[in-house]
């Protein structure tokens, strides 16, 4: 057994190095704390699961039953042909290595494997075993125990609601066994047959060493946890359906950082869990399959404070790649105490907390993420998007770089931003991809900086006390298309521009589904608002200083408006807001004064750090204009000032004037620049 375990760990490390160089798990039992419950960012384990887009870990082979011991079950009796096994009182005990073919029905008995260090294969061929007092299939001692499901057969294991720990092979103190299929040795489930596990007492399938499921169709209905491999849990080319009160798929070894990992590859998983869907004490990799996970009753349920009900969870790093994922979770849908890496796949997510959360770095380089409902969309110490197609609907922030542990960790449900202070190391970096955000809070929110050098970002923030853009230190815009619309009075502009940008106030609140057009000689950008907006920031590489841009709203559009950016059609019937001569940096028009977010605020400048101010809490003297400031009516390409009364700023000299009859505000003095 030790030699096999060494091989398994070495193979995991080798596969990780060979695969993850090209591309990268944890919940406690109700009565035990795992190391990951202690929170904080954890480093990745040296040995980890195999990774994304990998071929199957092995080639399945048909089992040759020549020379096998034949065990035939018939009600309360058992017949045995061959050596290595004996039966007494409905209990079959296997004491030698070899292959044992099992068929028939056992009304109230069990199979026990007690073969020392020898490898044992139990081939189930239409077997149904019911045991009212313990595990129907109990691997007490073996080198490696293999349960082979013969092709085309259906097999069932069913236990009772209570166990009797009265023999020398069981332990009431250690609660062993505590699963319908329980192994104290490395356990492999394989074969082209089917296995149904009805676990009425506690857990469905448990291995205290490694668990590997290949090629099989396995269904588990468990009172507590579903499928547990303590040292590691590998599922490859399998169909697994789990309904359970605890975690559906898990690995829990917290004493060895090379163990406790989960690898799921080329499989179809349907998991309905009262707690976590997939949880790994260290790292997890999920790839190339179809994964439907409902945890904690789904996104509309409220889990208890001490219950973790996440979709996919890792204690160190979590890597997700190709595959189709449907996640409906009351807690975080995707969570790691270390880093989360998403390189591909299609995701449909509804969650009562974060769609994807990393205490460390959250990186998206590909895939399609449709986050239909969340508290926060993407949250991490840093958030980096270099590719992919992302849609976020959130009641709070869309993308949030906060830094540290947000308090949700491996324990219970954690709403809100309870990160430990991240400072300027927190960052949102966007170099590619397409992002659309409809946020009840801030659209893009960083406790440190925001940097955008490419991609397309369309944001609508509908919260009255929030804005589309919110940052602590800086927002550098050096490429890409940005449209950030805000309904409230906390709108902010980029602080550093390497391409022209427009900051406009509409003079009214535009409703969702309203079109906004920015048109110049060389471009015609049309956006569809996904929420209410009273102001917006727009920038694109096509904008040029000194050129004229017309801004219109309303009207109709004949083409597609995927992700808020319209294409393939024509805009007509809009109301002209203004014709603006662009500055080389920021051109502001029609802004009204008021509270801004962190950073370079529309209509007022930076929030000062006063007696109670830290850039987050109001404090100090709000009469100072700060960046983009100026007294009312003062010329300035950066836009309006912050008058002592907190009222409107002045008009930008380059802003022009709106056409007659289309004045956005009631009077010119209300048109802050």
Short names for language-model regions:
Residues 5-12, 16-673:
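A composition-driven surface/loop motif
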Residues 1-3:
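N-terminal secretory signal peptides that target proteins for export/translocation
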